[in-house]
């Protein structure tokens, strides 16, 4: 098995519903708006999120981060880099929840914590209201200039509910 990290895609797919790559990525990022899908990812593919399968894996912590987890984190960053733009966000059914999930998934600690039911319930409790701090994503305000303010606010809301 080759240990080189996968090459990150250089180009974004053109925003066209006839482009298979675009529609595949649209379907994936749209599913991230569902906290229970995030839970499914955490339980079914913990290695992708950097979640250790057991606390007995003391050897894995000395080897460094899992290459699959690093590749998935890079892919999530790549997706967030362009889905937050109005050109692409217009295709999202629930842009606020989708972009909130993509933004939170940029944080390693969040990727590890989403296996906890309390975190998923806190996300589900937030619903689609107050997503993106009240910004109107459909009007073109995607929150990509807000820095870490939204991420910190989401973390605080989740911490209060757990």
UniProtKB/Swiss-Prot annotation:
Keyword Cell membrane attributed: no
One Pfam family, short name: Med31
Biased composition range(s): Basic and acidic residues: 141-162
Domain of life of the source: Eukaryota
Oligomer status and interactors: Component of the Mediator complex.
PANTHER family, A to Z: MEDIATOR OF RNA POLYMERASE II TRANSCRIPTION SUBUNIT 31
Main function: Component of the Mediator complex, a coactivator involved in the regulated transcription of nearly all RNA polymerase II-dependent genes. Mediator functions as a bridge to convey information from gene-specific regulatory proteins to the basal RNA polymerase II transcription machinery. Mediator is recruited to promoters by direct interactions with regulatory proteins and serves as a scaffold for the assembly of a functional preinitiation complex with RNA polymerase II and the general transcription factors.
Protein name per Swiss-Prot or TrEMBL: Mediator of RNA polymerase II transcription subunit 31
